[in-house]
Design a protein with these regions (language model features):
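Charge-dense, helix-prone N-terminal extensions
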Residues: 1-130
Length: 130
């Protein structure tokens, strides 16, 4: 029997991001978006719906990934596109309700790890075994 693939909802995305080491959340861009950060650096931006940037709400988040990884994911998945209002080379919009939970979690982890890899060595050390 084939294994059923589950999709994430907005609360599951939020909860998963907050479980990662050192993550904080805030709303610097208004009430319609939550950002998730490591050491003050944004790795994920979760749209809550409505607001001036998302009038026709479609569940999505923007995340930072390596440029070549963004290209690869966009080629393979129609639910991953260049991010709206972000540097399209480095950021992708992920329409998480159209993708498997496993893939969405992997993308969030990858984005989190990318930001950690850019931190100063002394700061990065506290995340190595997390």
């Amino acid at each position: 029997m084939e294994k059923l693939t589950t999709m994430m909802n907005i609360e599951q995305v939020r909860e998963y991001a907050l479980k990662l080491c050192g993550v904080t959340e805030d709303q610097p861009f208004g009430d319609d978006v939550v950002t998730f950060r490591v050491e003050g650096k944004i790795f994920l931006c979760l749209w809550l719906g409505g607001g001036k940037y998302d009038l026709a709400y479609q569940p999505r988040f923007a995340c930072k990934l390596a440029p070549e990884r963004n290209e690869e994911l966009r080629e393979h998945y129609g639910a991953i596109t260049p991010a709206f209002h972000w540097n399209k080379k480095h950021w992708s919009d992920v329409y998480y309700t159209l993708l498997s939970t496993e893939l969405v979690e992997a993308i969030i982890r990858e984005s989190h790890q990318l930001i950690i890899s850019t931190l100063p060595k002394a700061v990065r050390a506290k995340y190595q075994n997390a």
